[in-house]
From Swiss-Prot:
Listed PROSITE patterns: GLNA_1, GLNA_ATP, GS_BETA_GRASP, GS_CATALYTIC
Gene3D superfamilies noted in UniProt: Glutamine synthetase, N-terminal domain, Glutamine synthetase/guanido kinase, catalytic domain
Name of the molecule in the record: Glutamine synthetase
Catalytic activity: L-glutamate + NH4(+) + ATP = L-glutamine + ADP + phosphate + H(+)
GO CC terms: cytoplasm; membrane
Gene transcribed to yield this protein: glnA
Length: 473
């Protein structure tokens, strides 16, 4: 909701609000926050920001240059529904106090730069993003890693693996089968009321909502639908989405993960991302080409497909991401596009004759991504496709999963690991850095952070399944 700083300050006064909670996102994509007494906020705070120590924020400044400023966005002001005392919450971007410039490693700033870059090209003045983030709702999660042990244990009342266990009141047996959890009614769907509360809570926070439903996997996989929005707003909405879902779940004694593949041998959780460009209030992806798409829209797809291996370093940025991107679990592993074909990595959804509904859906991403970085990177790839008129090739209007190995060999595939995606980004990042949206320093630090904190530590540790394979060697 559009608000001025003066309106926010008046709201604080009128409602006698004493606590102001300022949220911002770190580089990997986790919200951080600090709460202030109300008198610490004035009109100057909305331009100059409020100082804080950024030395402990992942991927940011070293301790000797750590002073940063949180600049709250008044348009994001809401009352936090999970605080005992009335608390006004705002989402912030980050400034460098020494220079007064926006911080080039702040993901929200990078997202805003992507929109500025789009407008500067003259191609379009607005880009809409619509993420569809899936998640698992568990009743119990335990995990640990020491020098001589490694384990995890995830459990759900809906888990098919629990059909034979003793339960309080008796095991009633309503547990969806593997890959059979899509759209069941109660009592098989145990999360109806929880999802409804999640959805209505988001509506109260001005997130545009659509629907909710059970997803395909057993063990409590769910999805809530929120409407598309402008790039930065959509990323803000996704962070609110995750915040609300986790906190409502906790209220019910449950826990949520957006990990792409927490359960073996069942569907993983993705985050399909719908995208469209507009100019002067008119949609630019509607036309007379394939699937009612415009030539510009096809070039945008060409940019996504060309840069997809590098893009996945931002859209699928964890080692767990690549356990989802495997054949057989409705995950798009082949880089192709199609109308209505959900086995392609880029889909043009069937939208009837409504030009305003023309959009593409990139199906590779997952919700471990930082949405500000992922959306900005996808937009840069699409713009590169338009500027360089990148041909996406012929559409693939067959089920990719039914093709022979010889036919599949002709179709490019997604990277098989986070390390491979980072290697692709190292070789192909001009479409990001050449725009001024991503700085070379940021791309370099992202690769370094992911290798040092995720790829290499995973490589060093024995995996429990290795003991099943090799212990008696």
């Amino acid at each position: 909701m559009a608000r001025t700083p003066q309106e926010v300050l008046k709201w604080i006064q009128d409602e006698n609000i004493k606590i102001i909670d300022l949220k911002f996102i770190d580089t990997p994509g986790i919200w951080q926050h600090c709460s202030f007494y109300y008198d610490q906020l004035d009109e100057n705070s909305f331009t100059e920001g409020i100082p804080f120590d950024g030395s402990s924020i992942r991927g940011w400044k070293a301790i000797n240059e750590s002073d940063m400023c949180m600049v709250p966005d008044p348009n994001t002001a809401t009352i936090d529904p999970f605080c005992k005392e009335p608390t006004l919450s705002m989402i912030c971007s980050i400034k460098e106090p020494r220079t007064g410039e926006w911080y080039n490693r702040d993901p929200r700033t990078i997202a805003a730069k992507a929109v500025e870059y789009l407008r500067g090209t003259g191609i379009a003045d607005t880009v809409y993003f619509g993420p569809e983030a899936e998640f698992f709702l568990f009743d119990d999660i335990r995990f640990g890693q020491t020098e001589n042990s490694s384990y995890y244990f995830a459990d759900s009342v809906e888990g098919r693996w629990n059909t034979g266990r003793e339960e309080e009141g008796g095991n009633l047996g309503y547990k969806p089968g593997y890959k059979q959890g899509y759209f069941p009614v109660a009592p098989t769907d145990t999360a109806q009321d929880i999802r409804t509360e999640m959805l209505l809570t988001m509506a109260g926070l001005c997130v545009p909502i659509e629907k909710h439903h059970h997803e395909v996997a057993s063990g409590g996989q769910n999805e809530l639908g929120i409407k598309f929005d402008k790039l930065v707003n959509s990323a803000d909405n996704l962070m609110i989405y995750k915040y609300v879902i986790k906190n409502v779940a906790k209220k019910y004694g449950k826990t949520v993960t957006f990990m792409p593949k927490p359960i073996f041998n069942d569907n993983g959780s993705g985050m399909h991302v719908h995208q469209s460009l507009w100019k002067d209030g008119q949609p630019l992806f509607a036309g007379d080409k394939y699937a009612g798409f415009s030539q510009m829209g096809l070039w945008y797809i060409g940019g996504i497909l060309k840069h997809a291996p590098a893009l996945l370093a931002f859209t699928n940025p964890t080692t767990n991401s690549y356990k989802r991107l495997v054949p057989g679990f409705e995950a798009p592993v082949n880089l192709a596009y199609s109308q209505g074909n959900r086995s392609a990595s880029v889909r043009i959804p069937l939208s009837g004759g409504n030009p305003k509904a023309k959009r593409l859906e990139f199906r590779c991403p997952d919700a471990t991504s930082n949405p500000y970085l992922a959306f900005a990177a996808m937009l840069c790839a699409g713009i590169d496709g338009i500027k360089n008129q990148i041909d996406p090739g012929e559409p693939l209007d067959v089920d990719i999963y039914d093709l022979s190995p010889e036919e599949l060999a002709k179709i490019p595939s997604t990277p098989g690991s986070l390390e491979a995606a980072l290697e692709a980004l190292e070789k192909d990042h001009e479409f990001l850095t050449g725009t001024g949206v991503f700085s070379p320093d940021f791309v370099e630090s992202w690769i370094e952070y992911k290798l040092d904190n995720e790829v290499n530590p995973m490589r060093l540790r024995p995996h429990p399944y290795e003991f099943s394979l090799y212990y008696d060697c």
